Amino acid sequence: MAPSVPPAPGRRERRRHEVHERLLEAAAALFDARGVSATTVAEICARADVADKTFFNHFGSKQDLLRELAGRSLGRLLERIEQARKTGGTTRERLLLFFADVAADLERAGPMHRELVTEMIHVAHEQRLGSEQARALHAAFRALVEDGRAAGEVARGHDPATCTELLLGAFYALVFDWAHLPDYPLRRRAQAAARFLGDAFAVSPRTARRTQGRGRR
């Protein structure tokens, strides 16, 4: 039996989705321009051109809207990790690419984006949402580490869980420092973090020579 095809959404569902997206887009633009705390629900509704009460048909509060933005932000971050995994080159080069992309994404945003990023990370790790999102991010970084182990570029003596935690910690430290330090040299620190991690994870030259020697026997 052929799998059933779900029915196309009706006009009402399409309209609801359109309004939902307009509210998210309006909120993200206002948060970037003015900051999260300075933006009211009424201002979001005015920018989205909907009645104030319509907001609460979609979100219970501004914090609930932030949770959805946080989820979408995580989705984009997971895409960045996947892009880095699919590129050629070594694990070190993939780390350099990932951290460079993260820095570029953050720098392209407006100055108030720092507050938005801080709020979104906080929201994403609240008890109701954090466990699922934290597991997804941890799994994505773990996959990058395991790719390196499979390629013989990450030392077998390094616990992959520890490597994953170091990678995750470096990412969070980079984002938090950028969000809280006005003159933080984001691109330079991102590249330094990637180089450090790449070198720390790498198979030592002595181990590589020993492995090659066994292979020639």
Residue ranges and their predicted role:
Residues 1-34, 38-47, 64-67:
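Basic, helix-initiating cap at the start of DNA-binding domains
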Residues 16, 20, 24, 66, ...:
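Amphipathic, non-transmembrane alpha-helical scaffold segments
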Residues 33-37, 88, 109, 151:
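Short coil/turn segments at alpha/beta junctions that flank glycine-rich nucleotide-binding fingerprints
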Residues 49-59:
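Short hydrophobic/aromatic patch on the recognition helix
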Residues 68, 79-109, 160, 164-167, ...:
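Hydrophobic alpha-helical connector segments
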Residues 76, 101, 105-109, 123, ...:
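Phosphate/oxyanion-binding loops and surfaces in catalytic or ligand/nucleic-acid-binding neighborhoods
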Residues 103-143, 153:
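Short secondary-structure transition hinges
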Residues 113-118, 149-195, 206-217:
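Hydrophobic/aromatic-rich alpha-helical bundle segments in the mid-to-C-terminal region
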